[in-house]
Structures are given as C-alpha cells and as structure tokens.
Swiss-Prot record:
This is Probable glutaredoxin ssr2061. Signal peptide: none annotated. Has a glutathione-disulfide oxidoreductase activity in the presence of NADPH and glutathione reductase. Reduces low molecular weight disulfides and proteins. The keyword Disulfide bond applies.
Length: 88
C-alpha cells in the first residue's frame, strides 16, 4: 500500500513531544513536511490559525486535516486508525 497522504508537522527543535511524534512518522516510513518554527512568531500564528487556535507543539496535519499533537497521533496509532489516514 503506497503512502499518498500529504503529512505536515510543525515542530520546535528541542521539544520532546515533537521528537516523539517525528519518531513515529519515521517508524511508519512515511514522507512528511516538517516546519521547524523555533522563535518564528509569524509561523506559529499561521500554524495556530490552521490548528483551531492551538499553539502547542507539535501540530500535525494529514491531507490538510488537523490531527492534533503527539498524544493524538499516538492515540490514532494505538486504535489502528493512523495507517488508513497515512495511506489514504
């Protein structure tokens, strides 16, 4: 099954939750676009606008659908719902 979903993740370089979410995506073997927004307030505002006002990191989007943060993507994976999204 080929990965065709567009995956985007907003991160902060020293954020442990960001590192954990990135590790999951790497384990899944999927390609993703990472936006490291360290100290970039404009980028953070743009992310928050896409993420229903959420400013915490990471924020993850699959095919422009807001997934949430680290706990959210791991919950989807644990429920068996992440792979279908990644391979949509």
């Amino acid at each position: 099954m080929a990965v065709s979903a567009k995956i985007e993740i907003y991160t902060w370089s020293t954020c442990p939750f960001c590192m954990r979410a990135l590790a999951l995506l790497k384990r899944k073997g999927v390609e993703f676009q990472e936006y490291c927004i360290d100290g970039d307030n404009e980028a953070r505002e743009a992310m928050a606008a896409r993420a229903n006002g959420k400013r915490s990191l990471p924020q993850i989007f699959i095919d422009d659908q807001h997934i949430g943060g680290c706990d959210d993507i791991y919950a989807l994976d644990g429920a068996g719902k992440l792979d279908p999204l990644l391979h949509s």
